[in-house]
């Protein structure tokens, strides 16, 4: 909605070229997101492409106030994660990190492979938020004026998606030092498209096999012959 409002304002100001450029980027972003199946997974590379399209739109609104830094390891780029998992985090970073500050903020997205796991961190250099304590799952937080309750709702939704997809095999942490800034760390089991397809292929035969009919009990023959006598010469 913010993007549409910005386009409307540009049209009213007769800045048609800028409005057309923003509309084109918005169209590309929406097309990119609509081809993804709901609840499906994408590679980290695809998720980063989506984020770059989204940030390209926001860049036209905030200009030099919005700075981004993508750091993705080659192996991490192949890993899979739930589609559109990171976009709400970037949106929060813009709304509560970039927007409130005159100088804006930098948003960093880092993806790396740590042992058998994928680790993704989304952070910003905004005003941050205070935290009461950190629990095993979603930390209990007390938003400041800069980060209202909507942030907690967005984070809770992401946590719930991770719990549904990975159970206890995921890690979700919020960090906000007193000096400012805000970051969310996510860890998932490392999985590529190939390994996921292989897992599905090995699971399908067992699921597709029809239940076996109970066979008739086999007859049990008990020998009643006496033991064979030893021959004597």
Question: Language-model segments: what does each one mean?
Answer:
Residues 176-233:
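C-terminal end segment of the histidine kinase catalytic
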